[in-house]
Amino acid sequence: MLATLRLFLFFLPFFHLHTFADDCPDWAAARASSEVVALQQQIDRWDDAYHREGRSVIADELYDQSRLRLNQWRQCFNLPSPPEPLRTASGPVAHPVAHTGLDKLHDAADIATWLRDRQNVWVQPKVDGVAVTLIYRDGRLHQAISRGDGVRGQDWTASAKKIGAIPQQLTQPQDLLVQGELYWRLNGHMQARAGSANARATVAGLLGRKDLGAEHAAGIGLFVWDWPHGPRDLPERITALTQFGFPTTVPYTQAVASLNDAQHWRDHWYHSPLPFATDGVVLRQSLRPPAERWQARPPYWAVAWKYPFAQALADVRKVHFKIGRTGRITPVLELSPVMLDDRQIKRVSVSSLRRWQELDIRPGDQVAISLAGLTIPRLDSVVLRSTERADLNVPLASDFHALSCWQPTPGCESQFLARLTWLSGKQGLALPHVGRGTWEKLLETGRLNSLLDWLTLDGPELANIAGLGERSSARLLHSFHSARQRPFAQWLKALGLPPTGQATLADSWQALAQRNTEQWQAEAGIGPGRAAQLSAFFRDPQVLTLSETLQAAGVDGF
């Protein structure tokens, strides 16, 4: 049975919840109870798979955040806490020295406060693995104990004796106890780019097996982060441990004299290739109390500065359906703000209506998001579904296409606005000082009932629009007037003419409108599908009406 399930859980009350929205959900008591029960049951299912089968069905950091979310909800609604989450991670073997754990901080301001009255501070990467106690008798490995609940753990001695990274015989015949992290070896792992890579779950699952194979044992490394009964000074402890035969941590132990120093090493290790996954850095004073006084709770002499999550758990507030110029429907999720790589994310695209239908995302659902290419928010999965499934006004894909919504009729507002934005943009008429916000203002006033109504707007009408000053109105009027001088080919693109490849285009609307599908297909680079689209475009009644409007306005080619 896996012994050290989710080692951080014992210290949930000490986490800062900056990743999540500060406000509590606006739920009635019954709803709050059902949502908490649903999340608890989901976590229990993850735990069961992790305990009984040694497999992780969710990324480590999403599990961590789900636990935080559960704790937050319980605090919001004063709901009783469940039994101690590490109760199943405890074991029959007592630790001679307690594992303390760490306070987890996320903000530089909190770190600055912590550093203010401390001296002789050192920083190390916070290796993302599973904690262990190693006990030596006369220089020989005697026992390995899982962290468990910090006081008692499981006996891992049999597995430890197969792990090459753990010295089986020290260079000196000494009685010794060290605490450290068993981690999954990674080659050139860059935390900022690759995230946790489920490294913690991997090594925990292997150590939970009854028989650790040689190949898997070779993939496990050791990072010793404390020698409770060692010399008073931290550099002395590290030097001596290296001389005893433990893997050196000297390159990963740096002096900190200021917040800038801590920030430097945190950023450096976050973006540098390392042989292990990390989830932050650990700041620790060189001097600490005698080991006999240590307790299974965060100490005052060490603290963790967590990295931003590479994958965040986000609460869905609303689901919008954005309809583009060509009728493509893109669902967009409005989220409670979350932080990813020090960026605040408030919305994410679901990519397509079909994907949204497969995922069936509703307000109140919890979703996993990340940054694609470290820049673009990306929806990864649904982590938890809300117990109440909100009704949504979902547009029908069959109602929207390249020739729909030439007026802002009910249901067409999104596509109509997209048509206007395209028309004035660089792909269309390239009108200066005209953008999406301009069209939104005009639509709010009811002055646009078709795609080209703006051609007849005059100065007094624009001046009466809220938010448009005299100067803005004058510039806008000049842009609208200049549109009449744009070339015919530019107007065709602005109206949404399907791509024509290498086809030769006549310089008049009448000539193009007379072409049938076969004539379009005879042009270079135009296949049957595109030919049908072009033929339909020039025969559409709404498009024909627009061409007549442009002819009356004196636009060349119409």
Curated annotation (Swiss-Prot):
Active site: 126 (n6-amp-lysine intermediate)
Gene Ontology process terms (BP): DNA repair; DNA replication
SMART domains given in the database record: LIGANc
Catalytic activity: NAD(+) + (deoxyribonucleotide)n-3'-hydroxyl + 5'-phospho-(deoxyribonucleotide)m = (deoxyribonucleotide)n+m + AMP + beta-nicotinamide D-nucleotide
Molecular function terms from GO: DNA ligase (NAD+) activity
Family note: Belongs to the NAD-dependent DNA ligase family. LigB subfamily.
HAMAP family from the UniProt entry: DNA_ligase_B
Listed name of the protein: DNA ligase B
Biological source species: Pseudomonas fluorescens (strain Pf0-1)
Lineage: Bacteria, Pseudomonadati, Pseudomonadota, Gammaproteobacteria, Pseudomonadales
